[in-house]
Curated annotation (Swiss-Prot):
This is Phosphopentomutase. Mn(2+) 2 binds at D306, H311, H359. It holds the Pfam family Metalloenzyme. Its EC number is 5.4.2.7. Belongs to the phosphopentomutase family. GO terms for biological process: 2-deoxyribose 1-phosphate catabolic process; 5-phosphoribose 1-diphosphate biosynthetic process; metabolic compound salvage; nucleotide metabolic process. It is an enzyme of class 5 (isomerase). Binds 2 manganese ions. Isomerase that catalyzes the conversion of deoxy-ribose 1-phosphate (dRib-1-P) and ribose 1-phosphate (Rib-1-P) to deoxy-ribose 5-phosphate (dRib-5-P) and ribose 5-phosphate (Rib-5-P), respectively. GO terms for molecular function: magnesium ion binding; manganese ion binding; phosphopentomutase activity.
Amino acid sequence: MKRAFIMVLDSFGIGEAKDAKSFGDEGADTLGHIARACARGEADIGRQGPLHLPNLSRLGLGKAALESTGRFPEGLDENAEVIGAYGYANELSSGKDTPSGHWEIAGVPVLFDWGYFHEHQNSFPQALLDTLVERANLPGYLGNCHSSGTVILDQLGEEHMKSGKPIFYTSADSVFQIACHEETFGLERLYELCEIARDELNKGGYNIGRVIARPFVGDKAGHFQRTGNRHDLAVEPPAPTMLKKLVDEKQGDVVSIGKIADIYANVGITKKVKATGIDALFDATLQEMRQAGNDTIVFTNFVDFDSSYGHRRDVAGYAAALELFDRRLPEMLALVKEDDILILTADHGCDPTWHGSDHTREHIPVLVYGPKVKPGSLGERDTFADIGQTVARYFGLSPMAYGKPMF
């Protein structure tokens, strides 16, 4: 029985990519800088001491980071007995965004350039804004700028609740984000507005990767909180991913947990499981692993590393979340059967010690575990697509156009 379990620790980079300088990210190192802060007592909020990741270390995380950066992460166990295969991968795709990283993991790198809204103020074309106001019957809009999602809620949340005007904002990624209060504006109305925005962006040829619904609750600045009802409206991958090939060629199953289905625009997904928070995502993953049959991929995105800690530049929070994941990892390893493979990886970096609030261009870890997987180094991989090619070969699918099998 063949089953693959793919876990994306969203934004968990392990050192600057070769082309990091062209992204303004030379020197970025999500894992390394978190580990250094912990070792120096600079991340003792809600946790204490050096970064403690014994189970990820057994899968080769520290050694993969050493290969990536030439430095072993401070505080991690250099003498851990490694029970898995480990390496690191470069990104071939043109961007450092979520769809690019995930599509490339599934064998389809993004070799075109996304469209972006470059202006930090008055970010969106007036014609687009006017059309959205008219089609969605809006009283107007707020924002129209680059911003961190949490900052803009404190700045404009109260005005939004009073006026009924949605908050439009973007970032360095190819995104059009819309924040609205779940109760005063309405969740379904927000989703409908996002559908309209997606349609207009498509028709206008803007080539924007995602429209993201950002619902929130609360009653005043400092008390607003984004909810788990986020919804991403992505464009479809430009070629069949290994997910779609598994469904088409083997009539297999692909179980999406978290935002995976949104990222792939539901293409190649046979079941969607919604969960919010690391523990809930972990619980849902374990449940699906227990019931997975032959020719099944269980694919989980642990978004909190990125959304709650990376973008918010919360080093201690990121460290605590990694330690929580690590504590629960033995539960996952125990469910890996004789012919299964478990792959732990990331989609980009988001160094919480870095300037700004955007992603960082980094290598990703590639940690592979299974009773039939030979422990040892997988070395440097030229593309995230090596993961997709490896999974395609494992299931006996037609080869992907990009990537080399790792074993």
